[in-house]
Amino acid sequence: MKSHLQSYPCPLQINSFWNLGFLLGITIILQIITGIFLGLHYTSDLNSAYSSLFFFIREIFYGWCLRYLHSSGASFVFLFLFLHLGRAISYGSYFYNPNTWFSGILLFFFLMATAFMGYVLPFGQMSFWGATVITNLLSSFPSLIEWVSGGHYVYNPTLKRFFIFHFLFPFLLCGFRILHLFYLHFLSSNNPLRNSTNNKIPFFPFIFQKDFFGFILIPAICFNFL
């Protein structure tokens, strides 16, 4: 444990772009925590889904804060995700460490699926449109679309399925993230100069300081948007 958390060797040349993975992990954890509390009061029914969210905002102590942390946090997840992905493409991480790259791509697809299903859950006018678009993407597979939507059109079974998938997928994401970290620590990190040097520094305290600064910066920015 010490070799992976404290004395883990990191390239000397890495910059702040290498902290985006940590920030992405923190925002995903924040999404899971706030999503659990939202799920406790959410009703997956066409007639009461929208009102259950407003009940959570108005009647639950600090419910408005949890709800907007969840919705604003999703924006930060995708901000850090695309910056993290762009950094990997820009510095050739996909060539240096392909196993880490492919495990990250799996994370990306699961995260996109989770976000699409979460977009449907409030079930206003735009949510109905989103559910219709998502299910129509599977129209080439009749048996699959009927299983996903629970019928021949978007209705209560569709919303229940999307809620269950949206609730379960983040925990599957945690499993893929462990796999992603395993490959990262097994094959080490890339660096901006793309050179294989043995001149490395321990993760703690040098890299930890940058990660901790980002950890403090996220809540400050997020609460500013609230």
Segments (PLM) and residue ranges:
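Membrane-embedded and interfacial regions of multi-pass energy-transducing membrane proteins
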Residues: 1-226
